Amino acid sequence: MLMGSIARRYARALFSLAVEQGRVEPWNDALQVLKNAVEGSPDLRDVLSNPVYSKEQRRAIVEKLASALKLEREPANLLFLLGDRNRLAYLAAVVDTFRSLADQHLGRLRARVTSAVPLDASAAQAIADRLSKATNAKVLLDRAVDPSLLGGVIAQVGSLVYDGSVRTQLEDLRKTLKQ
C-alpha cells in the first residue's frame, strides 16, 4: 500500500511536468525504455542503489545511460532521484502509474490480449479495432502468449473480459454434457 502511494506521488509529479511541457507521450516512451534497461541489468540496479557509490558516481552513470538511451533530462532524473533516495524498487510502479495517467490523459485504453500463439500484426490490429469499437476509445494492446488456451484469444480491457478461447469453449461444453 505504501509503495503504491509513494509511486503515485512520483508519477503524478513527473506527469504534471510532462503535461505542462507538452511531453506526455515522449516521456511515457522514455520511461518504458528506462524501466526495461534497469530491469534488464542487475549491475545497473546495484550501482544505483548501493551506497558504496557516491552521488557523483551514480549521477555520472545515470547521465551516461541517459545519453546512450537518448533520454531527456527529466525522465533520466527520475532514475537518479529514486536511486539517491533508496527507492529504486519503486521505478516499475512509478513508470506503470505514469503510463496509466498518460493513457487516461490521451483518451486511450490498454487491453491485455492473450492468445495460444503469437499474433501477427494484422490479427492484432483487427482485435484492437474491434475492442476500440466496443469501448468507444482507442485501444492499445499488450500481448501475451499462453499455449494452454489451445486456440482463440482472451482480451481484458479494465474489468471486462472477452473470452474467445478454445479452452473455455471446451470447458463450457464439458459442463453442459455433464448436466
UniProtKB/Swiss-Prot annotation:
Subcellular location: Cell inner membrane
Gene Ontology molecular-function annotations: proton-transporting ATP synthase activity, rotational mechanism
Keyword field contains Nucleotide-binding: no
Domain of life: Bacteria
Entry keyword annotation includes Cell membrane: yes
Membrane topology type: Peripheral membrane protein
Keywords: ATP synthesis, Cell inner membrane, Cell membrane, CF(1), Hydrogen ion transport, Ion transport, Membrane, Transport
One Pfam match: OSCP
Cellular component GO terms held in the UniProt record: plasma membrane; proton-transporting ATP synthase complex
UniProt cross-references to InterPro entries, sorted A to Z: ATP_synth_OSCP/delta_N_sf, ATPase_OSCP/dsu
Biological role: F(1)F(0) ATP synthase produces ATP from ADP in the presence of a proton or sodium gradient. F-type ATPases consist of two structural domains, F(1) containing the extramembraneous catalytic core and F(0) containing the membrane proton channel, linked together by a central stalk and a peripheral stalk. During catalysis, ATP synthesis in the catalytic domain of F(1) is coupled via a rotary mechanism of the central stalk subunits to proton translocation. This protein is part of the stalk that links CF(0) to CF(1). It either transmits conformational changes from CF(0) to CF(1) or is implicated in proton conduction.
Alphabetized PANTHER family for the sequence: ATP SYNTHASE DELTA CHAIN (PTHR11910)
Family: Belongs to the ATPase delta chain family.
Assembly notes: F-type ATPases have 2 components, F(1) - the catalytic core - and F(0) - the membrane proton channel. F(1) has five subunits: alpha(3), beta(3), gamma(1), delta(1), epsilon(1). F(0) has three main subunits: a(1), b(2) and c(10-14). The alpha and beta chains form an alternating ring which encloses part of the gamma chain. F(1) is attached to F(0) by a central stalk formed by the gamma and epsilon chains, while a peripheral stalk is formed by the delta and b chains.
Name of the molecule in the record: ATP synthase subunit delta
Species this chain originates from: Anaeromyxobacter dehalogenans (strain 2CP-1 / ATCC BAA-258)
